[in-house]
């Protein structure tokens, strides 16, 4: 009996795919992604035209299959898109958009792929304009921008930061963490850092007000002391005048 093989049925994805990315290797990797994601979301809190994600799968199969052609950048930003929650980034459901900026957080097990295979993918297929990588333990840090279809290394500025033309922000290392900086050189704060800064500002204002109050109290005490001294001098003069009058001496005729 001849067995008839059933034709392979393509696996089409559901409308919203979950990310297939594995857990991050170390707490420092997780912390780095949280810093990048939360600081940028806070800094662009008034914008609705971008999507930023960390450790999320990007599905980009030309056949719209979920089981082929997928990658998971550690951190990426897509510009000129709707800002809303997603479980993954599915290129064919996003008007063919790929990330504008990618940051890979290197580890010993992924560094070779990030420096080579992924770099070529982001350059030749995704055409991602800005690509950075950073090793949270060795502090290896490089960035590339797409020029005429090829990645060109971005030069460091005086602070050893790299400029992202897509983000209009600097990317640089501070306290062994990769951070964003404004064109003016100000650190892009996380929500926690902003709250701490606000608390510090309130505390400084409180201390300033307390210092002003103490200064005002000291000025009031000085004025009271001067008034008391004047009053004591007046009383002494009155007593002396009275004694002179008792002695038959007119104090107004003295002197």
For the regions a language model picked out, list residue spans one by one.
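C-terminal interaction segment
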Residues: 2-25, 39-42, 60-73, 78-101, ...
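A structured, charge-rich N-terminal accessory region that forms the first stable segment of a protein
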Residues: 30-43, 51
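A generic secondary-structure signal marking the coil-to-beta-strand transition
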Residues: 32, 48-50, 73-74, 99
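A short acidic/basic microdomain associated with nuclease active sites
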Residues: 46-61
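A structural signal for short, well-ordered beta-strand segments and their strand-loop junctions
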Residues: 51-53, 132-135
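Short acidic/polar active-site loop segments enriched in Thr and Asp
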Residues: 129
